[in-house]
């Protein structure tokens, strides 16, 4: 039976690969997409998500979400993804529109209609998820688990300690990590290992039309290079859903620093139990890289 999922995203070039896998992996049933400001503005992430859905002729409802973090000024990752968020490929025009309600309400309504609890997947800042949990706490029993791409037990990628998705809205992340829902965190400890090799990247234009599109996007992606390999950060959250055997997880207490002058946005991962607090997150600490690369190749071969 296919696993029902809702995907919250901020496309973003590596988001595009994650969205492809979420749509076409035969084990998954992507029922709703929502967008959030992150890699670029929410208007751009929404436009990019709609372009991808149209490209793949995927009839999946999409709702636009939060334009700004809960309490602080927005930051973006245009330096990594380009000013549009998905530079490098000319998508055809379409007339698709997002739903007429905010993302967190769209998630609430879809959860309440679902016949069974649903897995939420968040591969951008956690603003929409925090709004859902704080404004609609009655939804918690309908969430099977939350799988995120975000955080790190070690170094950061936008500050020495903080990963971008958490640092973009630390207050939202803190709310989510305190919520009591089941959380799986695929952070930089694994996503920095999730590299597509130059040899594989060179095969994409001959794979299919999606391969050609992704190859064009990848030429503008700055998380690695076409010559050294590219990190597929967001794809790790989708990979865990389908191939959890590729990941080494450890239950840990995780908190988010919101006040530090140099550490705001840091996920404090208590690997050794020093704080004596109960674990609230399953933290991915290692990845079977060859297995991941093989799975990616298998999934992208299924995409038209």
From Swiss-Prot:
<keyword id="KW-0378">Hydrolase</keyword>
<feature type="active site">
    <location>
        <position position="233"/>
    </location>
</feature>
<dbReference type="GO" id="GO:0006152">
    <property type="term" value="P:purine nucleoside catabolic process"/>
</dbReference>
<dbReference type="InterPro" id="IPR022976">
    <property type="entry name" value="Nucleosid_hydro_RihC_nonspecif"/>
</dbReference>
<dbReference type="GO" id="GO:0005829">
    <property type="term" value="C:cytosol"/>
</dbReference>
<dbReference type="GO" id="GO:0006206">
    <property type="term" value="P:pyrimidine nucleobase metabolic process"/>
</dbReference>
<dbReference type="GO" id="GO:0008477">
    <property type="term" value="F:purine nucleosidase activity"/>
</dbReference>
<dbReference type="GO" id="GO:0006144">
    <property type="term" value="P:purine nucleobase metabolic process"/>
</dbReference>
<dbReference type="InterPro" id="IPR001910">
    <property type="entry name" value="Inosine/uridine_hydrolase_dom"/>
</dbReference>
<dbReference type="InterPro" id="IPR015910">
    <property type="entry name" value="I/U_nuclsd_hydro_CS"/>
</dbReference>
<dbReference type="Pfam" id="PF01156">
    <property type="entry name" value="IU_nuc_hydro"/>
</dbReference>
<dbReference type="GO" id="GO:0045437">
    <property type="term" value="F:uridine nucleosidase activity"/>
</dbReference>
<dbReference type="InterPro" id="IPR036452">
    <property type="entry name" value="Ribo_hydro-like"/>
</dbReference>
<comment type="function">
    <text>Hydrolyzes both purine and pyrimidine ribonucleosides with a broad-substrate specificity.</text>
</comment>
<keyword id="KW-0326">Glycosidase</keyword>
<dbReference type="InterPro" id="IPR023186">
    <property type="entry name" value="IUNH"/>
</dbReference>
<protein>
    <recommendedName>
        <fullName>Non-specific ribonucleoside hydrolase RihC</fullName>
        <ecNumber>3.2.-.-</ecNumber>
    </recommendedName>
</protein>
<comment type="similarity">
    <text>Belongs to the IUNH family. RihC subfamily.</text>
</comment>
